[in-house]
Amino acid sequence: MQIFHNLNEWIHFRNTLSPDLSLGFAPTMGNLHAGHASLFLASSKENHYTVSSLFVNPTQFNNPDDYKHYPRTVDADLELMTQNGVDFCILPNENEIYTDGYAYQVQENRLGQLMEGKHRPGHFNGVLTIVMKLFNLVKPTRAYFGEKDYQQLLLIQGMVKALFMDIEIKSCPTVREKSGLACSSRNNRLTPSQREIADEFAKIFHQNKSSAMISKELEALGITVEYIEEFQGRRFAAVKIGDIRLIDNYLL
Protein backbone atom coordinates (compact mmCIF):
# COMPACT_ATOMS: atom_id res chain seq x y z
CA MET A 1 0.00 0.00 0.00
CA GLN A 2 1.27 3.44 -0.94
CA ILE A 3 0.81 6.17 1.69
CA PHE A 4 0.51 9.90 0.95
CA HIS A 5 1.12 12.33 3.81
CA ASN A 6 1.09 15.36 1.52
CA LEU A 7 -1.89 16.37 -0.59
CA ASN A 8 0.24 17.86 -3.36
CA GLU A 9 2.03 14.52 -3.72
CA TRP A 10 -1.31 12.74 -3.95
CA ILE A 11 -2.70 15.21 -6.51
CA HIS A 12 0.39 14.79 -8.68
CA PHE A 13 0.16 11.00 -8.43
CA ARG A 14 -3.59 10.99 -9.11
CA ASN A 15 -3.01 12.92 -12.33
CA THR A 16 -0.65 10.20 -13.57
CA LEU A 17 -3.31 7.47 -13.33
CA SER A 18 -5.02 6.46 -16.55
CA PRO A 19 -8.65 7.62 -16.84
CA ASP A 20 -9.43 4.08 -17.99
CA LEU A 21 -8.73 2.74 -14.49
CA SER A 22 -11.57 2.59 -11.96
CA LEU A 23 -10.97 3.88 -8.43
CA GLY A 24 -13.01 2.84 -5.42
CA PHE A 25 -12.89 5.13 -2.38
CA ALA A 26 -13.80 4.53 1.27
CA PRO A 27 -13.04 7.57 3.47
CA THR A 28 -12.45 6.97 7.19
CA MET A 29 -11.60 8.76 10.41
CA GLY A 30 -9.45 5.88 11.60
CA ASN A 31 -9.88 3.58 14.61
CA LEU A 32 -10.92 1.00 12.04
CA HIS A 33 -12.95 -2.17 12.58
CA ALA A 34 -14.64 -4.96 10.62
CA GLY A 35 -17.19 -2.55 9.18
CA HIS A 36 -14.45 -0.54 7.48
CA ALA A 37 -12.78 -3.73 6.27
CA SER A 38 -16.02 -4.70 4.52
CA LEU A 39 -15.96 -1.42 2.58
CA PHE A 40 -12.37 -1.96 1.46
CA LEU A 41 -13.09 -5.53 0.34
CA ALA A 42 -16.21 -4.48 -1.57
CA SER A 43 -14.20 -1.81 -3.37
CA SER A 44 -11.29 -4.09 -4.20
CA LYS A 45 -13.69 -6.53 -5.90
CA GLU A 46 -15.19 -3.85 -8.15
CA ASN A 47 -12.31 -1.52 -9.03
CA HIS A 48 -8.78 -1.55 -10.40
CA TYR A 49 -7.58 0.37 -7.33
CA THR A 50 -8.94 1.10 -3.87
CA VAL A 51 -8.21 4.38 -2.10
CA SER A 52 -8.88 5.26 1.53
CA SER A 53 -8.19 8.25 3.74
CA LEU A 54 -7.40 8.69 7.42
CA PHE A 55 -8.57 12.06 8.70
CA VAL A 56 -10.28 12.82 12.00
CA ASN A 57 -12.50 15.61 10.71
CA PRO A 58 -12.93 18.31 13.38
CA THR A 59 -15.86 20.05 11.69
CA GLN A 60 -18.28 17.16 12.17
CA PHE A 61 -17.84 17.01 15.94
CA ASN A 62 -20.38 19.23 17.68
CA ASN A 63 -18.86 18.13 21.00
CA PRO A 64 -15.18 19.16 21.34
CA ASP A 65 -14.60 16.40 23.92
CA ASP A 66 -15.64 13.76 21.36
CA TYR A 67 -13.04 15.10 18.94
CA LYS A 68 -10.38 15.27 21.64
CA HIS A 69 -11.01 11.69 22.79
CA TYR A 70 -11.49 10.11 19.36
CA PRO A 71 -8.93 7.26 19.30
CA ARG A 72 -5.94 7.76 16.98
CA THR A 73 -4.67 4.30 15.99
CA VAL A 74 -2.81 5.04 12.77
CA ASP A 75 -0.41 2.07 12.73
CA ALA A 76 -3.18 -0.48 13.35
CA ASP A 77 -5.40 1.27 10.80
CA LEU A 78 -2.77 1.15 8.08
CA GLU A 79 -2.22 -2.54 8.80
CA LEU A 80 -5.94 -3.27 8.50
CA MET A 81 -6.07 -1.37 5.21
CA THR A 82 -3.10 -3.30 3.85
CA GLN A 83 -4.72 -6.62 4.77
CA ASN A 84 -8.02 -5.71 3.14
CA GLY A 85 -7.11 -4.55 -0.32
CA VAL A 86 -6.40 -0.83 -0.01
CA ASP A 87 -3.83 0.30 -2.59
CA PHE A 88 -3.46 3.98 -1.66
CA CYS A 89 -4.06 5.82 1.62
CA ILE A 90 -4.18 9.60 2.06
CA LEU A 91 -3.30 11.07 5.47
CA PRO A 92 -3.88 14.81 5.14
CA ASN A 93 -3.56 17.33 7.95
CA GLU A 94 -6.18 19.85 8.98
CA ASN A 95 -4.40 22.88 7.49
CA GLU A 96 -4.19 21.18 4.10
CA ILE A 97 -7.85 20.20 4.10
CA TYR A 98 -9.21 23.47 5.44
CA THR A 99 -7.08 26.05 3.66
CA ASP A 100 -10.21 28.25 3.72
CA GLY A 101 -10.61 27.92 7.48
CA TYR A 102 -13.97 26.20 6.90
CA ALA A 103 -15.41 29.36 5.34
CA TYR A 104 -17.00 27.28 2.58
CA GLN A 105 -19.47 24.62 3.67
CA VAL A 106 -21.88 22.17 2.07
CA GLN A 107 -25.29 22.35 3.72
CA GLU A 108 -28.51 20.39 3.19
CA ASN A 109 -31.65 21.91 4.69
CA ARG A 110 -34.21 19.07 4.82
CA LEU A 111 -33.08 15.58 5.80
CA GLY A 112 -30.00 17.08 7.45
CA GLN A 113 -32.22 18.75 10.05
CA LEU A 114 -33.81 15.51 11.26
CA MET A 115 -32.62 12.86 13.72
CA GLU A 116 -28.81 13.16 13.86
CA GLY A 117 -28.97 16.66 12.42
CA LYS A 118 -31.44 17.77 15.08
CA HIS A 119 -29.40 16.34 17.95
CA ARG A 120 -25.97 17.24 16.56
CA PRO A 121 -26.24 20.75 15.06
CA GLY A 122 -23.69 21.35 12.32
CA HIS A 123 -22.65 17.69 12.16
CA PHE A 124 -23.81 17.02 8.63
CA ASN A 125 -22.37 20.30 7.32
CA GLY A 126 -18.99 18.99 8.44
CA VAL A 127 -19.62 15.54 6.96
CA LEU A 128 -20.80 16.76 3.57
CA THR A 129 -18.03 19.35 3.33
CA ILE A 130 -15.21 16.89 4.03
CA VAL A 131 -16.73 14.28 1.72
CA MET A 132 -17.00 16.85 -1.07
CA LYS A 133 -13.36 17.87 -0.57
CA LEU A 134 -12.17 14.26 -0.56
CA PHE A 135 -14.24 13.41 -3.65
CA ASN A 136 -12.59 16.30 -5.49
CA LEU A 137 -9.16 15.09 -4.41
CA VAL A 138 -9.65 11.40 -5.16
CA LYS A 139 -12.00 11.63 -8.16
CA PRO A 140 -13.32 8.11 -7.52
CA THR A 141 -15.41 6.01 -9.85
CA ARG A 142 -17.28 4.57 -6.87
CA ALA A 143 -17.41 5.49 -3.18
CA TYR A 144 -18.36 3.09 -0.38
CA PHE A 145 -20.31 3.90 2.78
CA GLY A 146 -21.80 1.70 5.48
CA GLU A 147 -25.52 1.49 6.19
CA LYS A 148 -24.90 1.94 9.92
CA ASP A 149 -24.73 5.68 9.21
CA TYR A 150 -27.79 5.47 6.97
CA GLN A 151 -28.85 9.11 7.27
CA GLN A 152 -25.33 10.12 6.27
CA LEU A 153 -25.50 7.71 3.32
CA LEU A 154 -28.78 9.27 2.11
CA LEU A 155 -27.33 12.77 2.37
CA ILE A 156 -24.19 11.84 0.43
CA GLN A 157 -26.30 10.16 -2.26
CA GLY A 158 -28.45 13.30 -2.42
CA MET A 159 -25.44 15.62 -2.62
CA VAL A 160 -23.88 13.65 -5.47
CA LYS A 161 -27.16 13.69 -7.40
CA ALA A 162 -27.95 17.37 -6.74
CA LEU A 163 -24.47 18.57 -7.71
CA PHE A 164 -24.18 16.33 -10.81
CA MET A 165 -21.12 14.50 -9.52
CA ASP A 166 -20.10 11.54 -11.65
CA ILE A 167 -19.58 9.14 -8.73
CA GLU A 168 -21.47 5.95 -7.97
CA ILE A 169 -22.33 5.73 -4.27
CA LYS A 170 -22.32 2.14 -3.02
CA SER A 171 -24.02 1.18 0.23
CA CYS A 172 -22.65 -1.72 2.27
CA PRO A 173 -24.62 -3.64 4.94
CA THR A 174 -23.99 -2.87 8.60
CA VAL A 175 -21.44 -5.27 10.09
CA ARG A 176 -22.45 -6.50 13.52
CA GLU A 177 -20.73 -8.23 16.40
CA LYS A 178 -22.00 -11.62 17.65
CA SER A 179 -24.38 -9.91 20.05
CA GLY A 180 -25.98 -7.95 17.22
CA LEU A 181 -24.35 -4.68 18.27
CA ALA A 182 -23.31 -2.66 15.23
CA CYS A 183 -19.53 -2.37 14.84
CA SER A 184 -18.45 1.13 15.84
CA SER A 185 -15.27 2.89 16.86
CA ARG A 186 -17.15 4.04 19.97
CA ASN A 187 -17.61 0.45 21.17
CA ASN A 188 -13.95 0.42 22.21
CA ARG A 189 -14.68 3.08 24.82
CA LEU A 190 -17.34 1.02 26.62
CA THR A 191 -16.45 -0.46 30.00
CA PRO A 192 -17.22 -4.19 30.47
CA SER A 193 -20.47 -3.39 32.29
CA GLN A 194 -21.44 -0.79 29.68
CA ARG A 195 -20.68 -3.33 26.98
CA GLU A 196 -23.25 -5.72 28.46
CA ILE A 197 -25.82 -2.92 28.39
CA ALA A 198 -24.89 -2.09 24.79
CA ASP A 199 -25.48 -5.70 23.79
CA GLU A 200 -28.92 -5.50 25.41
CA PHE A 201 -29.60 -2.28 23.48
CA ALA A 202 -28.96 -4.11 20.22
CA LYS A 203 -31.35 -6.93 21.17
CA ILE A 204 -34.14 -4.69 22.42
CA PHE A 205 -33.87 -2.24 19.52
CA HIS A 206 -34.42 -5.03 17.00
CA GLN A 207 -37.59 -6.32 18.67
CA ASN A 208 -40.85 -6.20 16.73
CA LYS A 209 -42.39 -3.65 19.08
CA SER A 210 -43.41 -0.01 18.91
CA SER A 211 -40.76 2.68 19.25
CA ALA A 212 -42.40 3.80 22.50
CA MET A 213 -42.20 0.32 24.03
CA ILE A 214 -38.58 -0.06 22.94
CA SER A 215 -37.70 3.32 24.47
CA LYS A 216 -39.32 2.30 27.75
CA GLU A 217 -37.37 -0.96 27.91
CA LEU A 218 -34.08 0.78 27.13
CA GLU A 219 -34.66 3.49 29.74
CA ALA A 220 -35.37 0.77 32.33
CA LEU A 221 -31.77 -0.40 31.78
CA GLY A 222 -30.45 3.09 32.49
CA ILE A 223 -29.92 3.90 28.80
CA THR A 224 -30.57 7.50 27.76
CA VAL A 225 -32.68 7.49 24.60
CA GLU A 226 -32.08 10.54 22.40
CA TYR A 227 -34.48 9.36 19.73
CA ILE A 228 -36.09 6.31 18.19
CA GLU A 229 -37.79 7.27 14.94
CA GLU A 230 -39.13 5.64 11.81
CA PHE A 231 -38.19 7.19 8.47
CA GLN A 232 -38.58 5.85 4.93
CA GLY A 233 -39.31 2.33 6.13
CA ARG A 234 -36.41 2.14 8.55
CA ARG A 235 -36.15 2.50 12.32
CA PHE A 236 -33.37 4.75 13.62
CA ALA A 237 -32.01 5.16 17.14
CA ALA A 238 -29.47 7.18 19.05
CA VAL A 239 -28.78 6.34 22.69
CA LYS A 240 -26.21 7.10 25.35
CA ILE A 241 -24.71 4.57 27.71
CA GLY A 242 -22.85 6.65 30.23
CA ASP A 243 -21.17 9.25 28.04
CA ILE A 244 -20.83 6.92 25.03
CA ARG A 245 -23.27 7.69 22.22
CA LEU A 246 -24.34 4.83 19.95
CA ILE A 247 -26.51 4.86 16.82
CA ASP A 248 -28.17 2.10 14.83
CA ASN A 249 -30.88 1.53 12.24
CA TYR A 250 -32.53 -1.28 10.35
CA LEU A 251 -35.09 -1.92 7.62
CA LEU A 252 -38.57 -2.57 8.98
Curated annotation (Swiss-Prot):
<keyword id="KW-0436">Ligase</keyword>
<feature type="active site" description="Proton donor">
    <location>
        <position position="36"/>
    </location>
</feature>
<dbReference type="InterPro" id="IPR042176">
    <property type="entry name" value="Pantoate_ligase_C"/>
</dbReference>
<feature type="binding site">
    <location>
        <begin position="29"/>
        <end position="36"/>
    </location>
    <ligand>
        <name>ATP</name>
    </ligand>
</feature>
<feature type="binding site">
    <location>
        <position position="60"/>
    </location>
    <ligand>
        <name>(R)-pantoate</name>
    </ligand>
</feature>
<dbReference type="GO" id="GO:0005829">
    <property type="term" value="C:cytosol"/>
</dbReference>
<feature type="binding site">
    <location>
        <begin position="146"/>
        <end position="149"/>
    </location>
    <ligand>
        <name>ATP</name>
    </ligand>
</feature>
<comment type="function">
    <text>Catalyzes the condensation of pantoate with beta-alanine in an ATP-dependent reaction via a pantoyl-adenylate intermediate.</text>
</comment>
<feature type="binding site">
    <location>
        <begin position="183"/>
        <end position="186"/>
    </location>
    <ligand>
        <name>ATP</name>
    </ligand>
</feature>
<dbReference type="Pfam" id="PF02569">
    <property type="entry name" value="Pantoate_ligase"/>
</dbReference>
<feature type="binding site">
    <location>
        <position position="175"/>
    </location>
    <ligand>
        <name>ATP</name>
    </ligand>
</feature>
<dbReference type="InterPro" id="IPR014729">
    <property type="entry name" value="Rossmann-like_a/b/a_fold"/>
</dbReference>
<dbReference type="InterPro" id="IPR003721">
    <property type="entry name" value="Pantoate_ligase"/>
</dbReference>
<keyword id="KW-0067">ATP-binding</keyword>
<dbReference type="GO" id="GO:0004592">
    <property type="term" value="F:pantoate-beta-alanine ligase activity"/>
</dbReference>
<feature type="binding site">
    <location>
        <position position="60"/>
    </location>
    <ligand>
        <name>beta-alanine</name>
    </ligand>
</feature>
<comment type="subunit">
    <text>Homodimer.</text>
</comment>
<comment type="pathway">
    <text>Cofactor biosynthesis; (R)-pantothenate biosynthesis; (R)-pantothenate from (R)-pantoate and beta-alanine: step 1/1.</text>
</comment>
<dbReference type="GO" id="GO:0005524">
    <property type="term" value="F:ATP binding"/>
</dbReference>
<comment type="similarity">
    <text>Belongs to the pantothenate synthetase family.</text>
</comment>
<dbReference type="GO" id="GO:0015940">
    <property type="term" value="P:pantothenate biosynthetic process"/>
</dbReference>
<keyword id="KW-0547">Nucleotide-binding</keyword>
<protein>
    <recommendedName>
        <fullName>Pantothenate synthetase</fullName>
        <ecNumber>6.3.2.1</ecNumber>
    </recommendedName>
</protein>
<feature type="binding site">
    <location>
        <position position="152"/>
    </location>
    <ligand>
        <name>(R)-pantoate</name>
    </ligand>
</feature>
<keyword id="KW-0963">Cytoplasm</keyword>
<keyword id="KW-0566">Pantothenate biosynthesis</keyword>
